[in-house]
A protein has these predicted regions:
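Charged, alpha-helix-forming regions
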Residues: 1-25, 30, 34, 39, ...
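One face of beta-strands
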Residues: 3, 17-21, 59, 65, ...
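Short small/polar-residue motifs
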Residues: 1-6, 71-77
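Intrinsic, low-complexity N-terminal interaction/targeting segments
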Residues: 11-18, 75-100
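Generic recognition of cysteine residues
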Residues: 23, 73, 106-107
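Residues that cap or initiate secondary-structure elements
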Residues: 27-29, 38-40, 82-84, 95-97, ...
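Mixed-charge, glycine-accented linear interaction segment located at domain edges/termini
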Residues: 95-116
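Short, well-structured hydrophobic secondary-structure segments
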Residues: 27-69
Length: 116
């Protein structure tokens, strides 16, 4: 299986956007629904650009707080795996499957490289 992260818009209004996130690696695949707004999307774009331009060594983005007190959280921490252009993205996802987010979550790495 090819590693990837795919976001698909489910709906939006003037305050929020609901996204379906599918994150896949050789060891795990998760599907979860998260809520974001324009500012959170802009922050993810900014973090990725800063990382790719070499302005930061590591980027971290999350759509909210981890835990049972809110909607499902998805966080992405990205950093260089080596000097050959390989990148690791640590995916932490709370699964919105009816259980407590503190108990129904997973964390794994998605591998990619510059230019993909």
């Amino acid at each position: 299986m090819k590693d990837n992260i795919i976001f698909s818009k489910i709906w939006e209004d003037i305050f929020a956007i609901q996204l379906k996130a599918v994150c896949s690696s050789s060891v795990a695949t998760i599907t979860t629904e998260i809520y974001v707004d324009d500012d959170l999307i802009d922050e993810l774009i900014f973090q990725i650009k800063q990382f790719l331009d070499g302005n930061i060594e590591e980027g971290l983005w999350a759509n909210g707080e981890k835990g049972d007190g809110s909607t499902a959280c998805l966080s992405l921490r990205f950093f260089n795996k080596d000097k050959l252009g390989h990148i690791n993205i640590e995916v932490y996802a709370e699964l919105d499957d009816g259980g407590k987010h503190s108990e129904h979550n997973c964390c794994f790495f998605v591998e990619t490289e510059y230019g993909l």
